[in-house]
Amino acid sequence: MKSGRGKSCGKLWKAPRRNRLISVAHSKQAALGFRVHSGWAALVAVRLEKSAPVVLVRQRAHLVETFTYEFRQPFHTAGKMPISQARDFIERVRDKAQRLAHRAIHGLQSDLQKQGMALKSCGLLLASGKALPNLEKIIASHALIHTADGELFREALLHASRRCGLQATAIKERELLEQAVQAFHLKPAELMRRVIELGRALGAPWSKDEKLATLAAWLALRASLKGGGRTLSGGAA
């Protein structure tokens, strides 16, 4: 996705057909799924209708105020600074990401509530899911820098989800399809066919981001309805 130089991204990024609410007749429980990138995330909200998922909302939200490399790759940027300055910079980016994530999630809650929906849970896709070391060790390792950039934005979404009262389910992305197959008793091909079909009525974008976020939301909703779910912990810097 192309970035605008110096462009303010305090509001949700919008494009034709990208954000759509489907009216419903009465109150239902909904769940959000997140797939995170550097500085932004794909969000999909679903509910169940006759045990099948229905997409309620599909958005892409910015998690940085200025959508440039400096802020989208904060640990890369911090690695070029003295350690005290780097620590302050990371904290500023983290704080802003948490605020923007909360704005996005709380806004969705309000919109869905007006449609008679109760947003109560979320599914967050993880990379490795491993805890990161301190900042000094992170910026000394190029591999850890890449990992930490993504984790900062995942943690921001988790923090915001908790503030909004959502039950969070953390799912390693490489295990997502296997978990979904076991949970919904569908073969992988049939499962993905259903997810692809969900996007046909919505139009673009319905990329890998939205498809995986949908599966994460579906699993989170199932966990919430069954009274389960597991919350991600740990952090960087």
Give a label for each model feature.
Residues 13-16, 21-230:
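Phosphate- and other anionic-substrate recognition elements at nucleic-acid/protein interfaces
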Residues 3-10, 15:
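Acidic, proline/serine/threonine- and glycine-rich low-complexity intrinsically disordered segments
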Residues 233-237:
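Long, low-complexity, intrinsically disordered segments
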